[in-house]
Amino acid sequence: KMEKNLKIGVIGAGIQGVCSALFLQKKGYEVILFDREEPGGSAASSGNAGHFSPYASIPLNRPDILTDIPAMLLSSTGPLALKWNHVPKMIPWFLKFLKNCSTKNMMHTAKYMHQILDIALPAYDELFEEIDLSGLVENKGIMYIWNDQNLKSRELEYNIRKEIGAEQQLLNKKEIHDLEPNIKKIYHAGVFYKKARHTRNPGKIW
């Protein structure tokens, strides 16, 4: 248990740093926030997607990513790029990454990530009660859609989230267009995460 007369330093004035500092203040601690910029500046928290994603508990290093890596590296528009002269320095990290791609390690991470994310929204709500968020946060959920009718491309993710207890709803073609009538009728399957939220402007929140 920490003494209340301690001064606590929090490094980084992004959304995580600001939230950590505020909760420490609410518990009675004196907090100093360190950053090169003022909160709400131009760092990562101002340029993120603005999603509150309680479903996002599955780590990147998972069994099926191993078969995707070669195609990612060879594609000029792929999401993965390497500076080959840096590869020798990356080998220790990459070996640890591969080790954690096992189903056992992936499920271990997903389980505990879910426990953290499950309490994240109530924690945000506690902070948001103290600031004016008029028109900034939408509680409309988020929908992922695919033109693959049997949803095989996302079967692993769906089953993992089902096992750890994440709230999700499978959608058919009709349900997709009931939720979003303006989407082209080429999508046959989807998943809806009702508890997800988004903000219109991440920078204005903190």
Residue ranges and their predicted role:
Residues 91-205:
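Rossmann-like flavin
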Residues 47-115:
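Glycine-rich active-site loop/strand segments that organize a redox cofactor
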Residues 6-33:
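N-terminal Rossmann-like FAD-binding beta1-loop-alpha1 element of flavoenzymes
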Residues 26-46:
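Glycine-rich FAD pyrophosphate-binding loop
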Residues 4-6, 11, 27, 47-48, ...:
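Residue-level preference for short coil/turn positions at secondary-structure junctions
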Residues 19, 23, 51, 160:
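Hydrophobic/aromatic ligand-binding patch that stacks against planar heteroaromatic rings
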